[in-house]
Amino acid sequence: MTATKMNAQEIIQFIANAEKKTSVKVTFEGQLATAVPSSVVKLGNVLFGDWKDVAPLLEGLVENQDYVVEQDARNSAVPLLDKRAINARIEPGAIIRDQVEIGDNAVIMMGAVINIGAEIGAGTMIDMGAILGGRAIVGKNSHVGAGAVLAGVIEPASAEPVRVGDNVLIGANAVVIEGVQIGSGSVVAAGAIVTQDVPENVVVAGVPARIIKEIDAQTQQKTALEDALRTL
């Protein structure tokens, strides 16, 4: 399995050194009394920028006109991923932070949360409400079920991330604990809590998860992925 592109210490330094921002969108009435700095974007009567740059402009509104402020973070160190160049299907409501890698024809469903440093292989689906913690790695053509959690590891920096191989199916609401590796071709049953490494081509289930069988033709048929869902 591949190593993460950013190790824990690099992510820690990225966050520590990042300019912390409280990004806002402000709709206002009337006219601004002062010039708009280059750090703020003004489109008509709407301002986009960091609150520390926008707030002084609002204090100078002519005749104390009203304004409305929209914000979704405070002193954020990591922006959301710019998805425009990603060759994947990403549905509304997915929260994906910067420094995440997403392979071709992957699918990210509504409500999925993907933290900094995570890697998602080509053709892999991250289902509704699934969580990939910091530095979690999922291989190609895998499926992480709805509500499943791949625990993240950014601190302590010495800890190993979760690594999931190719052609793996992780059932709904399963939890994979920090540092665990899931071998290629394996299946994690719904609701399982995986606390130890899983070899290739087996089915694990339970709390804590145990191997219950090896992958057979019937299991492969039941867990086969649908390529049509990954068509762009």
Curated annotation (Swiss-Prot):
Pathway: Amino-acid biosynthesis; L-lysine biosynthesis via DAP pathway; LL-2,6-diaminopimelate from (S)-tetrahydrodipicolinate (acetylase route): step 1/3. It catalyses: (S)-2,3,4,5-tetrahydrodipicolinate + acetyl-CoA + H2O = L-2-acetamido-6-oxoheptanedioate + CoA. InterPro entries: DapH, DapH_N, Hexapep, Hexapep_transf_CS, Trans_hexapeptide_repeat, Trimer_LpxA-like_sf. Pfam families: DapH_N, Hexapep, Hexapep_2. It comes from the Bacteria. Keywords: Acyltransferase, Amino-acid biosynthesis, Diaminopimelate biosynthesis, Lysine biosynthesis, Repeat, Transferase. One of its GO terms (biological process) is lysine biosynthetic process via diaminopimelate. GO terms for molecular function: tetrahydrodipicolinate N-acetyltransferase activity. Its EC number is 2.3.1.89. NCBIfam families: DapD_Ac. Catalyzes the transfer of an acetyl group from acetyl-CoA to tetrahydrodipicolinate. Belongs to the transferase hexapeptide repeat family. DapH subfamily. This is 2,3,4,5-tetrahydropyridine-2,6-dicarboxylate N-acetyltransferase. It comes from Streptococcus pneumoniae serotype 2 (strain D39 / NCTC 7466). The gene is dapH.
